[in-house]
Amino acid sequence: MAVLEIIKHPNEVLETPCERVINFDKKLVKLLKDMHETMLIADGVGLAAPQVGVSLQVAVVDVDDDTGKIELINPSILEKRGEQVGPEGCLSFPGLYGEVERADYIKVRAQNRRGKVFLLEAEGFLARAIQHEIDHLHGVLFTSKVTRYYEENELE
């Protein structure tokens, strides 16, 4: 496994919709492993492929709960319910945090590393993290959804 360079904003790859994955091969498995390692070392809870310079619909999420590591390939949100408002940051925007409104519950359809389709339901912080990463895959940055930015001392 290797630690990948995290792309910082501004960079065109972060604002470009990603291609769907069609090849479920060893290259994809390596990308998933490297992304997860990179995310953990950077102390993140999610990482999308464009954040490491790869324009594919691939994301990893690990909010350090009982769910563990989630690999999302070609994900789409089928259902949203409720509302939550809270702080978000992004590994591509070091030191920047803002208040973002997200659905409190989501149902997602995605594929695993072998191409098998699965459904996932999430709520609370996990739902927030998944929505943030899926946005990345469509070239949408959290800064476009921020209602207000936090000062550094507000999140201590």
From Swiss-Prot:
Cofactor(s) the protein requires to work: Fe(2+)
SUPFAM superfamilies, A to Z: Peptide deformylase
Domain of life of the native organism: Bacteria
The enzyme's E.C. designation: 3.5.1.88
GO biological-process terms attached to the record: co-translational protein modification; translation
Record's keyword annotation contains Iron: yes
Cofactor binding, per record: Binds 1 Fe(2+) ion.
Molecular function as annotated in GO: metal ion binding; peptide deformylase activity
Binding sites annotated in the UniProt record for Fe cation: 90, 132, 136
HAMAP family cross-referenced by the UniProt entry: Pep_deformylase (MF_00163)
Family, similarity comment: Belongs to the polypeptide deformylase family.
Name of this chain's protein: Peptide deformylase 1
Phylogenetic lineage: Bacteria, Bacillati, Bacillota, Bacilli, Bacillales
